């Protein structure tokens, strides 16, 4: 299946790139990528192939300053990227929702789950909660 990339403008006027396969499933899997990663990475595309093979809705996106989204990476913050993840979650959630977060995306997934009862599953892949403290202390 051809993956057509779309863009949505968020509350910060960023044009955020995303792909949603909308297979009319009652389950949606969301992929939250890591710092400086984009939605064309190995994990994101492998999940895309698996969800399409199994008839499950799938949303992947680029945070501002990442991949095909607008913005400057150096102006990003965890709070800003959390808001972007929540923006997509609210727009594309279904009856059952599973978030898979990789690295920084695992941290953002945890923060999203703390604020939202519509999440039925959470998977962290090499989750990096509070990785910024270690990076800035160097």
Set out the residue ranges of the language-model regions.
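N-terminal cap/lid segment of alpha/beta-hydrolase-fold proteins
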Residues: 1-24
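Catalytic nucleophile-loop/oxyanion-hole region of alpha/beta-hydrolase
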Residues: 66-92
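Short beta-strand element of the alpha/beta-hydrolase
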Residues: 26-34
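Short substrate-entry loop that stabilizes the transition state in hydrolases
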Residues: 35-42
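Short beta-strand immediately N-terminal to the catalytic nucleophile in serine-hydrolase-like folds
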Residues: 99-101, 125
């Amino acid at each position: 299946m051809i993956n057509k990339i779309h863009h949505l403008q968020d509350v910060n006027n960023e044009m955020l790139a995303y792909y949603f396969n909308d297979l009319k499933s009652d389950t949606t899997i969301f992929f939250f990528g890591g710092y400086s990663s984009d939605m064309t990475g190995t994990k994101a595309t492998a999940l895309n192939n698996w969800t399409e093979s199994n008839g499950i809705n799938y949303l992947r996106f680029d945070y501002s300053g990442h991949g095909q989204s607008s913005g400057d990476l150096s102006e990003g913050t965890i709070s800003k990227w959390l808001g972007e993840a929540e923006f997509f979650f609210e727009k594309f959630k279904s009856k059952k929702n599973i978030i898979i977060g990789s690295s920084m995306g695992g941290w953002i997934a945890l923060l999203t789950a703390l604020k939202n009862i519509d999440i039925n599953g959470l998977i962290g892949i090499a989750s990096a909660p509070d990785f910024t403290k270690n990076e800035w202390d160097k």
